[in-house]
UniProtKB/Swiss-Prot annotation:
GO CC terms of this entry: kainate selective glutamate receptor complex; plasma membrane; postsynaptic density membrane; presynaptic membrane
Biological source species: Danio rerio
Protein name, entry field: Glutamate receptor ionotropic, kainate 2
Glycosylation sites: 67, 73, 275, 378, 412, 423, 430, 546, 751
Subunit and interaction comment: Homotetramer and heterotetramer with GRIK5. Tetramers may be formed by the dimerization of dimers.
Location of the protein in the cell: Cell membrane; Postsynaptic cell membrane
Gene this chain is encoded by: grik2
Catalysed conversion reaction: Ca(2+)(in) = Ca(2+)(out); Na(+)(in) = Na(+)(out)
Alphabetical GO biological process terms: modulation of chemical synaptic transmission; synaptic transmission, glutamatergic
Amino acid sequence: MQRIAGITKMVTHRRWLGLLLLLLCVGYSHGMPHVLRFGGIFESIESGPSGAEELAFKFALNTINRNRTLLPNTTLTYDIQRINIHDSFEASRKACDQLSLGVAAIFGPSHSSSANAVQSICNALGVPHIQTKWKHQVSDNRDSFYVNLYPDFSSLSRAILDLVHFFKWKTVTVVYDDSTGLIRLQELIKAPSRYNIRLKIRQLPADTKDAKPLLKEMKRGKEFHVIFDCGHEMAAGILKQALAMGMMTEYYHYIFTTLDLFALDVEPYRYSGVNMTGFRILNTENSQVSSIIEKWSMERLQAPPKPDSGLLDGFMTTDAALMYDAVHVVAVAVQQSPQITVSSLQCNRHKPWRFGNRFMTLIKEAHWDGLTGRINFNRTNGLRTDFDLDVISLKEEGLEKIGTWDPASGLNMTENQKGKTANVTDSLSNRSLVVSTILEEPYVMFKKSDKPLYGNDRFEGYCVDLLRELAAILGFGYELRLVEDGRYGAQDESSGQWNGMVRELMDHKADLAVAPLAITYVREKVIDFSKPFMTLGISILYRKPNGTNPGVFSFLNPLSPDIWMYILLAYLGVSCVLFVIARFSPYEWYNPHPCNPDSDVVENNFTLLNSFWFGVGALMQQGSELMPKALSTRIVGGIWWFFTLIIISSYTANLAAFLTVERMESPIDSADDLAKQTKIEYGVVEDGSTMTFFKKTKISTYDKMWEFMSSRRHSVMVKSIEEGIERVLTSDYAFLMESTTIEFVTQRNCNLTQIGGLIDSKAYGVGTPMGSPYRDKITIAILQLQEEGKLHMMKEKWWRGNGCPEEENKEASALGVQNIGGIFIVLAAGLVLSVFVAVGEFLYKSKQNAQLEKRSFCSAMVDELRVSLKCQRRLKHKPQPPVMVKTDEVINMHTFNDRRLPGKETMA
C-alpha cells in the first residue's frame, strides 16, 4: 500500500510539473522569445584579428542584453562566420549553415559578390538580410528581404556635386579606386553635360598602393581640384604620398567620398594649408553618441586598428557605427513582433520562414535614432532615407564641421563667417610668400643708394609700399622677385600658352603678383584677382606741341572765319532792309525847311549809302548823325545794336587771350584723329593689357587702330614703357598706355602731354593663382587700406612731382608788334584807301565844275587844287554857270531824296 501510495504521489507530482510546464509554454507562446539568434558573416584575412564590423556587431548585442531597455525579456545571441574576401561560394555555404541553426536575420558580408550570394539565399527563404556597405541597386531589383543602412550613393553623389558648385570649381579631377566608383559618382560624371564643368577621370593603380606616378601626372597637369573615391586606408596612403610630392599646399583642394575621413590621422597636414573636405554621418555632437563611442573605444582596445590603416585609436569607423545601428534597428523590429519564432531552414528545400514577410515589414517600418542619425527605410527597395551628413574641413585645429547636407534641403554651409573674417590674420601669419612683379615707374623701381642693397630692400615704389602694408595687416613675410621674361602676361594665339607674371601664377612659381597688372576677362579665366587697388583707363601719350606766337592778324582769331563772314552778310542784309523800310515808311520823310511849313517838298535821309554808314557806325560802336524816326526803322536799328553789342563783347573777351597766349596746336586731339591718319605712328606695349584691349575690341575706331598696329607690329610695338616713352620723345610717335602712368610721366617731363580723354576703363588688382585662398584675404586688406585712405596717400606720395609751369601762372607780358601789328596794317590800309577815294572825289568834282562853267577840265582842276592847298581858307566860291537860268528851270539837286507833298501843285 505504501508502495502504491508512493507511486500515486509521484504521479501527482508529475502531473503538477507537467501542468506547470504547460502553463510556462502557454505564457511563452504569448510573449517575446526568450532567446533569439542573429547571424553575422564577415570577411577577414585568414587567422587575422576581428574586423571593426564584427566587433561592433558583438558590441551592439552585448549592449542590448546589458541594458534591458529595448528587449527586457529577450536575450540576443549570435552566430559569427568568417569568410575570405570575394569568396561567394564560401559565403553561401556559411549562410546555409546559419539558417539551419535558426537565425532571425543575417548581417553581412560587405563585398558585393559575397553579399549578392547571401542575398539570393535570404530572399528565397524569407530571412531578412541586413547590409551596411554600399551595394549597386539595379532598377528592377526584386530583393524584398533586404535593407541597407549605408546612404544611397546617388544622394552622396549629389552632395559632392553641391560642394563643387559651392566652391565654384570649373575644372575637377575624379580619381576612383575600382569600377564601382564610376557607378557611385554617376551624378557628378553627368555634370559636364548640364553645368560648365570640365571633368577629368583617373583610376588609382589596382595592384599596388603606390599612387605617386598618378599624383605626378596630376601635378604636371595642374589639377588642383580633386575628388578621391576610395576607402580610408587608401585615402591615408594618398595623403602621405601627396605630402611627399609637395601637393599638400593651399592651392590644392581634395574632397574624399569616404565617410571615415574624420577618423584619419591628419596631424601632419594641419599647418600645410591644404584644403581637405569630406562628409561624416556619425553624429559625434550628440552626448549619448559620444558616450557610446567612448565605451566602444574600450572594446576596440582588444583589437586595435592596423598600423597602416591610417585610423586614430579610439575612433569608431562609419562601418562599425552602421553595424551598431543595424543591430538596434532589428531589435526594434523584434520588440514589435511578440509571437515571432525562428526555425531551422534548409537551403535545399526552398521552404521559406513563415514569419519572414511580417518580420521584414517590421524592420522596414522601424525607426531608430542611432549613432548615424535618424534611420528610416524605403519600404519598396529597402534603402535608407532622410539621413543627414556633416560637411567637415581641415583647419589648423583639425577637422571641423563647416556645414550640413541632407537629401531634402541640400547643402547648408554653417561655418561662422564672422570668425572666418577674424581669423584672416592668423591664417596667413608666419607664412612666406613669393611675390612676382615687374619694373615700371612709379610702381616698382630700383632704389637709388650708394650702398649695395639686397633682397626686398632693392625695390621701392607704389606697389612695394602696397605690399608692405598688406604684409603688415595679414602678418606674412614675402620675397619680391622680378618676372623672368619681363612681361605682364598674355596668351599666345597659336599655342594658347601664357607668359609673364600670369604664367608664373599658373605654374605656382609665385603666390602673388603685385604690379600694375590689369584685370581682364582672359586673365580672369586662368588666374584670380583681388578687388582693385587702382582704377584707370587707356590714353595717348604724345609730345607737347611747340608754342606758336600770334600772327600780325591774330586780332581776327577771336572769331572764326565763318563768324566773320556771317557778320558781313548780316551787315549787308540789315543795311538793305533798313534802306527799303525807310523808303516805304511815311514817317521817315520830313520837311527839309522847317521854317517854311507850306513847303511841298519832303526829304529822306536813309539813302543806300547812309544806310550802310548807319550799320558801320553801330558795329563800330561809334554811332552816326543819322537817327531813325519811324517805329519800323527803330526796331531794325535796335535789333542791330543788340546784335553788335553781343558780338563786340564776345570779341573783346577773347581778344586778350588770343593776343597774349602762345597757341599750342597739336596735330591730334583724340584717338579718332590717330585712326584717320597714318603719318604719326602709334603703338602699345607688346603682350600687355592695352594690346589685349585693342585686339579684342569691337568698336570700329579702335579696331581700325589695331589693324594699323598689327600690320606694323615690329615697328610700332615696344617691349617696355620706357622704350615707348623714349620713342615719343625722339620721333613722331604716339604711345597708348595707362592713364596713371601718363600722369606720372607728364609730371616729370614737361615735353610730354596726354592727348584726349580715356579710351576705356579698367583696374589694377593683386593676382593670385586660380583657387588661391589668399585672394579673399588680400581683398579684405585692400578694402581696409582704401577705407583708411592709405591708398590715396600712397598715390599722392609717388605721383606728386615738381610739376610743369601752368600757363595761367605766367605773368602777363607786354604786347609787341608781333601781337597787334595787324591793327596798324589795317589802319595804314584804311588811310591809303581814303587818300585814293579823296583823289577820285577831287577828280570827279573837278570834271563836274568844268562842265558847269563851260571850261577845260585842267583849268577847273587847277583852280580846285589851288583852293585846296590854301589850308587857312574855309570859304570858296560856288561854281556858277555862264548864263542865267530861269526860275522855272531850276533843277532840284535832291530830286532823288525829295518829293512833293501830296495835294500840292507843281511850281509854275
